Amino acid sequence: MKRRYSWPIGIFAIIVVLLIALHIALPYVVRDYLNGKLADMGDYRGQITDVDLALWRGAYKINGLKIVKVDGKVPVPFVNAPVIDLAVSWHSLWYDHAVVAQVQFFNPEINFVDGGPNKQNSQTGKGTDWRAQLGKLLPITLDEVQIHDGKITFRNFNSRPPVNMNASNVEASIYNLTNVVDKQGKRDARFEGKAKLLGHAPLETSATFDPLSNFEDFQFRLRARDIELKSMNDFASAYGKFDFNAGHGDVVIEAQAKKAQVSGYIKPLLRDVEVFNWQQDVENKDKSIFRSVWEAIVGGTETVLKNQAKNQFATKVELSGNVHQQNISAFEAFLQILRNGFIQAFNARYERPKPDAG
């Protein structure tokens, strides 16, 4: 009897040992495989520290993802994602008979950098097909993406003063990435997000888009409220050569694209604004007389434009452009259109043509 059962027990023991060895080795195999894929990302290079597998629930966790720019001197990574959790959607598997996954990013950070005249020192994501890279990192069809306590920054390390703008506490979700075509022939994914702009101002944003198109058809909305303008002084000083002494503001953006043609607007509404302050600006030895004169001009322009009854003023800048631009992706082209519109919204300009001489 003992010999009769010894072979099955031995085989079972070998299988158990092999499974344990596979369980121990597999995370390292997956990690090295992913690092090999992330090493070749065009202008960027990625690396992860380790992988945790939970095969019993059809999930795995990626720890310590960092993506950095290869060329140029950029002191911060483009992407820093401490934890990425991917799990098969059992609801979709059971009810829709589809193998799709939900992915959650915990405490991710994305850093955009303006390098000034030296474009190699800029970091915008240009030079890499990010949809293809996401497919390498998460090789399964995604239905839903969630972001928890994320952060988005805009930096300029070479400007005077250096610029560090950010949106923190980002909570966002993207739904229906694998949506089928509806009755109207559309395939719309939905994005919803909230954050704190500059650490204090509530920001809300939403969008709908076709996940399988090249960002040619979409609708986008963003609103930030109660921005303390003094917190934008580094940005205003570096790009507009003035700073705020007081005031609060809101910003609303609405944009849409149809067949790659973008339309929309940016509308800032500023309240109780003070730009020029004699004690702060003229008596401040760190500021030149020319800087003080410029701030006085900007402050004077603000006085002319504002609604005296409500002590507020607003402007509206129309957005237009095409997302098909040479050498950059459609998404980058849209961000460029937004950036140009935002700068234009805060630049003083004449509203009527110059009168004829004589």
Q: Over which residues does each language-model region extend?
A:
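Secondary-structure transition motifs
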Residues: G64-I174, L270-G300, A314, G321-R352
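Short acidic/polar mixed-charge low-complexity motifs
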Residues: Y44, G199-A201
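N-terminal leader/targeting pre-sequences
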Residues: D43-G72
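Extended lipid/amphipathic-ligand handling interfaces
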Residues: L38, V51-A54, A81-D96, F112, ...
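Short, intrinsically disordered, low-complexity segments enriched in Ser/Thr and Pro
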Residues: T178-D182, V262-I266, I343-G358
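N-terminal type II signal-anchor transmembrane helix
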Residues: M1-D43, A357
